Amino acid sequence: MAEKEHYERTKPHVNIGTIGHVDHGKTTLTAAITKVLSEKGLAQAQDYASIDAAPEERERGITINTAHVEYETDKRHYAHIDAPGHADYVKNMITGAAQMDGAILVVAATDGPMPQTREHILLARQVGVNYIVVFLNKTDLVDDPELIDLVEMEVRELLSEYDFPGDDIPIIRGSALKALQGDPEQEKVILHLMDVIDEYIPTPVRDVDKPFLMPVEDVFTITGRGTVASGRIDRGTVKINDPVEIVGLKDEVKNTVVTGVEMFRKTLDLGEAGDNIGALLRGIDRDGVERGQVLAKPGSIQTHKKFKGEVYILTKEEGGRHTPFFTNYRPQFYFHTTDVTGVVELPEGVEMVMPGDHVTFTVELMKPVAIEKGLKFTIREGGHTVGAGTVSEIDD
């Protein structure tokens, strides 16, 4: 048994999720995938009800319901997320609570693309989910094959509209419910869908293979040795004698060299993504580095003040604002490990933003921060979270 355990770890890991309009069959498809793969010993079958009863989670001060399902194909190990409500999807994608490397867009052939179909495609584009495979569901309920062709064409056009390769995206037709009920033809369709996902959604670059980045959480001095910046490594690796830059909150970037890496008071040869470490920095005094800055591989990240954000604003019930806000709203934007005040500029045609809204707006920060497309942030007022966002574009 232990050997099998070891083998499972060698499969590449990919995060995916189901997206699409309410009642188009996202959860049924998720259940069908687990059922069909369980028959090959690659998953534990989960029924609709258990996936639908998604547990509540908190991600950066926001409550989200998400179901996490695991399964394998012959080639890969997958973590699959499915969210019960539309608001849960929006919050999930914006907060990055469930990071997706690719998505299965479920569209009912009986309805065609609907408003949430469009909104989920837009969200996928804005938050950096770059690969979509389409499952055209409920095709057994449509008598005229020409109608299905028409729906497929509409879906392709919609994807192209949001800069996805609409003409090339794989579209699989089938019935998730029939597969779940054990129809052998539809079970084959599910296996085909998984083959397509294996092929079309690339294995992501592992965090450790990306350029080094560590948001600084704390700074202290070790007498006789120098200044230590501590934090959790976001990506990449760091070792003794690596050159790093101290970036953020100030206009100039400082260059230094890591002269020691420690974890739990022990010296470490190599710190990697996920590790909480302290990095000893050559020639940097106590006030030469501060919380909210980042240590990074030279040249890998710049500071910016102006960006566009894809944002979800909490409702009053979620602990958010009770009233709308307008252009020139000035909350704090919490990036990495610190708050920076910023001024909000709403897009043309948007007069105000209500609690519970999903909106794209421009922010001008009071201080430069090390940010890049895809970075997550929280919006706060007096220490309370009132929203969450993803940087969708750098504007300066």
UniProtKB/Swiss-Prot annotation:
Region (G5): 175-177
Reaction(s) the record says it catalyses: GTP + H2O = GDP + phosphate + H(+)
UniProtKB keywords: Cytoplasm, Elongation factor, GTP-binding, Hydrolase, Magnesium, Metal-binding, Nucleotide-binding, Protein biosynthesis
Gene Ontology MF term list: GTP binding; GTPase activity; translation elongation factor activity
Residue numbers binding Mg(2+): T27
Stretch list, region G2: 61-65
Stretches assigned to the tr-type G domain: 11-205
Chief localisation class: cytoplasm
GO CC, one annotated term: cytosol
A Pfam family reported for this protein in Swiss-Prot or TrEMBL: GTP_EFTU_D3
Residues annotated to bind GTP: 20-27, 82-86, 137-140
G3: annotated span: 82-85
Coiled coil feature spans: none
Region of interest: G4: 137-140
Compartment(s): Cytoplasm
EC number: 3.6.5.3
Protein family per UniProt: Belongs to the TRAFAC class translation factor GTPase superfamily. Classic translation factor GTPase family. EF-Tu/EF-1A subfamily.
NCBIfam families registered for this protein in UniProt: EF-Tu, PRK00049.1, PRK12735.1, PRK12736.1, small_GTP
Record text on subunit structure and interactions: Monomer.
Protein name according to UniProt: Elongation factor Tu
Lineage: Bacteria, Bacillati, Bacillota, Bacilli, Lactobacillales
Gene transcribed to yield this protein: tuf
